[in-house]
């Protein structure tokens, strides 16, 4: 258990990190969290101190509303937070309040591409929506569905602006009532009545960036709005990703541009980096540099707008849609927690896999040395069995099976964190400060 003095110092670092623009995200759930006896919100409440002690600045929570699916990704009555399988509205508000008390922002998982209806119309089709309030907010009919979603619509709506979602009605986001009422709902989630600070946009491929911009700007100021834009990469005949994934990351960068660029809170999950890392750590670390000598994902082009991650509830957890090699997970964290971009830690790895101390140690190195989303990156080695990089001239990291890379470590650097297949060094001054902080904390606990 951290001492009161230690927690105060951590809170100060968190606030300084938020002020400087440095973000450490934490996905606070997995695909099976809804099964938790006693409620997931209550379980997570008991882990807030561990999360804050790891230097986290933002916690991503599951979809909060009533949903046909237990995980929350088939929402219906959006204002009904008491029908969530993760807990009650009061438990959610208490959790958010606890996070705020530690200087942590809460990210809502916003599922607005599609929506499930409560009632059938005269055709016998489920397309009459109930908002979850006594009044008419979000009480919609089939004319609020995209007309090319022929399974559900009555043919009067606008065409869909993005990819189809077959399992539920695709909402017509060009409809003025839809835009206004969804914006009002988001503002309610952001208000003191609930308390969310930021958005994760689920299945953002389902509607255009211009539509996303409406909701981002309509809820400004918002801490961040990170979009899930998961598209297939380019693959070769051997089934592995092509070396050049510029087209893949260009699509992500284009989305950021179209929602407002630098002036917008819009960000993207860096699926390009995720896909390249999945293969690179399996003895192909030469992939971690592009043709211009930069990182090959979105972090190589626009790191301030990239949220990097190792796995999430879809790619990992029990779904295993695109899992990171399980024996190399800490190599993934050594990469994202030392590199530019905005890293996101996954609940399973931190709590269930027993990696809490190793991950927290990497975050501490990052924050101690002032590494941020826009830090400079110098790639020193990119062989099949070893990747070495220097960040801001303050941190050097290595991943891969090769043990000895000592010839690349600059004078005055000392080992700060290490584990299976990874090592991180920092300059002596930072190492000395960390040791002094540890001695102070130890003395305070005596």
From Swiss-Prot:
Gene Ontology molecular-function annotations = alpha-amylase activity; calcium ion binding
Q: Might you name a Gene Ontology BP term for this protein?
A: starch catabolic process
Q: Which residues bind Ca(2+) 2?
A: 130, 133, 135, 139
| Signal peptide residues on this chain, from the entry's feature table | 1-21
Classify the source by domain of life: Eukaryota
Q: Which catalytic reaction applies to this protein?
A: Endohydrolysis of (1->4)-alpha-D-glucosidic linkages in polysaccharides containing three or more (1->4)-alpha-linked D-glucose units
Q: Does the keyword Transferase apply?
A: no
* SS bond list: none
What's the Enzyme Commission number for this chain?
Answer: 3.2.1.1
**Active site per UniProt:** 202 (nucleophile), 228 (proton donor)
Which residues does the UniProt site feature Transition state stabilizer point to?
314
Print the keywords alphabetically.
Answer: Calcium, Carbohydrate metabolism, Glycosidase, Hydrolase, Metal-binding, Signal
Statement: the UniProt record of this protein carries the keyword Transmembrane: no
This protein's cofactor list reads:
Ca(2+)
Which SMART domains does the record cross-reference, listed alphabetically? Aamy, Alpha-amyl_C2
Question: What's noted on cofactor binding?
Answer: Binds 3 Ca(2+) ions per subunit.
Enumerate the residues binding Ca(2+) 1.
113, 160, 163, 170, 206
Q: Where does substrate bind?
A: 66-68, 73-74, 200-205, 230, 232, 250, 257, 294, 300-302, 313, 319, 398, 403-405, 415-421, 425
Q: In which residues is Ca(2+) 3 bound?
A: 149, 164-165, 168, 170
Query: What does it do?
Result: Important for breakdown of endosperm starch during germination.
Give the multimer and partner information. Monomer.
**Leftover remarks:** Binds starch not only at the active site, but also via accessory binding sites on the protein surface that are important for efficient binding to starch granules and thereby increase enzyme activity.
State the similarity comment: Belongs to the glycosyl hydrolase 13 family.
Q: What is this protein called?
A: Alpha-amylase isozyme 2A
Q: Which organism is it from?
A: Oryza sativa subsp. indica
